[in-house]
Amino acid sequence: MGKYIVKRVLQFIPVFLGVTLILFALQNIVPGDPIKLIGGDKALSPEVELQLRVRYHLVQTDEDGNAILDENGDPVQTSLVDRYLYYMNGLLHGDLGNSYQRKLPVTDIFAQKYPYTVKLAACAIVLEAIMGIGAGIISAVKRYSFWDILVTLTTSILVAVPAFWLGMLLQLFFGVILKDATGGAISMPISGAGGSSSQYQDWMHYVLPTITLASVSTAYAARIMRSQLLDVMNQDYIRTAKAKGLSNRAIIVKHALKNALIPVVTYIGVDFGGMLSGAILTETVFNWPGIGNEVYRAISMRDWPIVMGGVTLIVVVVMVINLLVDISYAFLDPRIRLGGPSDKA
């Protein structure tokens, strides 16, 4: 197991470097000067603009920290490689840089935003696990019944409907239609993350974003669960258990479910990292004060330190979760050995 973990960590390094390097290269392709956008409607003076470029390491400087000028008096731009190495050096020291627009360290901004994103993703994962696994089991056990047809139809609709559009439909129904129909007696928060003195009211703000974020993933989890459970139920050892007179409940709970859960757990585990990145649209629709919404705004304003910090954080989380999911294989199924025949899980 130890050798396997070390091997996977070493495999993560080129992936991480590749993703961050590609994103750095894209910054040069996307039109628009982020420094000129700092002033908003007011144009920055050449002196202030040059100071900002020096501060954000966008131009080369001498030993005294002054910008190096070329023959025409223009500042010499810092190369992509130099900026990348400068960013990676800061990253090793826990520094994600400073936001162009907000003038604050990116780590401080994310420290405020990250709890909201993690809690939203955690709620969505719990909903996905409960509803997806439960619906998949019911659909497989009640094959070709009304419940199977209902689950199949519902999952097909959820897969086809874009999550952000579902979010807007939920806002329309609970925030307008249902509220007007009941004279305001029944309503649901459709924006923000609360902040009131009532914990109940704060948690109510999580309901619609959680449903939106978990909708597509829950549908896929239910499909995988149904397919895997039906496949396991056709295995020889299940037929042997039936021949011994075990009840269907005992067969499913003690024998079939554990093996059928492995691909589902894999999907749900990996999906947590996907939710952290996929939460960008959901957080934007519901004006959620999380990292996704912050990154979305940063993209529109060319605030690259926040974009880089958000992507870096997501990549690290996804890689760690993938490793934890792989390790969990050995605990779900003792037949699986991650480190080879000589490495006991």
Over which residues does each language-model region extend?
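N-terminal signal-anchor/signal peptide hydrophobic helix marking the start
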Residues: 6-16
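Hydrophobic alpha-helical segments of integral membrane proteins
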Residues: 9, 48, 80-96, 106, ...
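An internal, D/E-rich "acidic patch" concept
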Residues: 62-133
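Alpha-helical transmembrane segments of integral membrane proteins
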Residues: 2-3, 114-147, 163, 193-345
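Membrane-water interface segments at transmembrane-helix boundaries in multipass membrane proteins
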Residues: 152-218
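Transmembrane helix irregularities
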Residues: 30, 158-161, 276
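Hydrophobic alpha-helical transmembrane segments of membrane transport/permease proteins
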Residues: 16-81, 178-202
